[in-house]
Amino acid sequence: MANYFNTLNLRQQLAQLGKCRFMGRDEFADGASYLQGKKVVIVGCGAQGLNQGLNMRDSGLDISYALRKEAIAEKRASWRKATENGFKVGTYEELIPQADLVVNLTPDKQHSDVVRTVQPLMKDGAALGYSHGFNIVEVGEQIRKDITVVMVAPKCPGTEVREEYKRGFGVPTLIAVHPENDPKGEGMAIAKAWAAATGGHRAGVLESSFVAEVKSDLMGEQTILCGMLQAGSLLCFDKLVEEGTDPAYAEKLIQFGWETITEALKQGGITLMMDRLSNPAKLRAYALSEQLKEIMAPLFQKHMDDIISGEFSSGMMADWANDDKKLLTWREETGKTAFETAPQYEGKIGEQEYFDKGVLMIAMVKAGVELAFETMVDSGIIEESAYYESLHELPLIANTIVRKRLYEMNVVISDTAEYGNYLFSYACVPLLKPFMAELQPGDLGKAIPEGAVDNAQLRDVNEAIRSHAIEQVGKKLRGYMTDMKRIAVAG
């Protein structure tokens, strides 16, 4: 099979990369009614599979789970989760032939096997759903022409999808119809009903394309969302310890610092995050972020280029075929780093202390968010898509580090995201070591003293922060998310 994106001509590639429309709430007036009375069969009962299924059932849809015979016979975790929540569970052969919509929510590396197994069982005119388009775009999976192929991609982990639904809200969502598979012209109606059933329409829905979702998703998770957090954690911890900071304190400052800092980002963008600093610290964080952007821009561009060309995907799929040798080696090496093995700090760090002593971390967040956004937009991805795949998801990923450091982040994210994270962080850490060696007192681990600042310089920096395109689009999109619960700030 050929990478689907690479079979398109340039005009088609640009059209699909640039497909992005914020949908009005009136477009979801019918809710999930298009799928009511139809049979929806979910394949896979992980975080997205279970939580989307719970939401869809609560929205009045007929939901069941198709699992492999071995998973049922051995009563594996997927079987237990589905049955304990009262869902009907059966084998592919038992459930797929009756399904009007088959939703594939298995891990990326399983998609080809799953799709090749279920396709012959699907009835004529049924629909196949994804929450990530890697199998269609990067693998180039060929789907029977009578089958409608749609995507509903919540921009949050599965647990968040469920929690926001229970509060009567939802999470921002991308929806798409594969242009090669919409034989009856009903793809958008199916996708809208599915998105409404998960609650996504209450937080904002972008009509996108499989191509735009995949390319922007890969870029975000490899760079700012995971790779930058991992590289930043390792670099900052080593720098603090090198300068005499207690390893336990250094570990907590970083582990909980990302979440505390990005909570401000979630509530008010880069502007609010920077406003949490004193004026001298803000000027220093801005200067550091500009240096970081200059150093890291070629690395961000290389990742985007490799994603667009398919180089990244072909390399990762080769590792799949080699039993994940690279992935597992990188995972093991990460687990042995000084940051991951440092002792726990039992004392309390106040909220403002994370900002005052984390100026470099704030600069890293600002630089990474802006670079990821700018690089995606320069590649033809629309600003709204770039925002969701950079700034919006960052607090959610930072929240995973609080639980069990980088180990937890890499467990929660997909194997695809984890592989890309390691590619980025393994390149970024050595790239930034000369920069780290030139840091000044107060950049990390110590607060910058209060002092006089130049009014004109402060005015210009504030204007530069607030006028960045990601701040403009972010203000609009956050207006749809004002009801989202506040992620608990670390204590």
From Swiss-Prot:
Which residues does the record give as Mg(2+) 2 binding sites?
217, 389, 393
Q: Where does the record place the KARI C-terminal knotted domain?
A: 209-344, 345-484
Alphabetical list of InterPro entries matching this protein: 6-PGluconate_DH-like_C_sf, 6PGD_dom2, KARI, KARI_C, KARI_N, NAD(P)-bd_dom_sf
Provide one Gene Ontology biological process annotation. Answer: L-valine biosynthetic process
Q: Where is the KARI N-terminal Rossmann domain?
A: 15-208
Tell me the route in metabolism or biology where this protein functions.
Amino-acid biosynthesis; L-isoleucine biosynthesis; L-isoleucine from 2-oxobutanoate: step 2/4; Amino-acid biosynthesis; L-valine biosynthesis; L-valine from pyruvate: step 2/4
Cofactor(s) named in the record: Mg(2+)
In this chain, substrate is annotated as bound at 414
GO CC annotation? cytosol
Entry-linked PROSITE patterns: KARI_C, KARI_N
Return the EC number.
Answer: 1.1.1.86
Q: What class of enzyme is it?
A: oxidoreductase
The protein's name: Ketol-acid reductoisomerase (NADP(+))
Q: What is the lineage of its organism?
A: Bacteria, Pseudomonadati, Pseudomonadota, Gammaproteobacteria, Enterobacterales
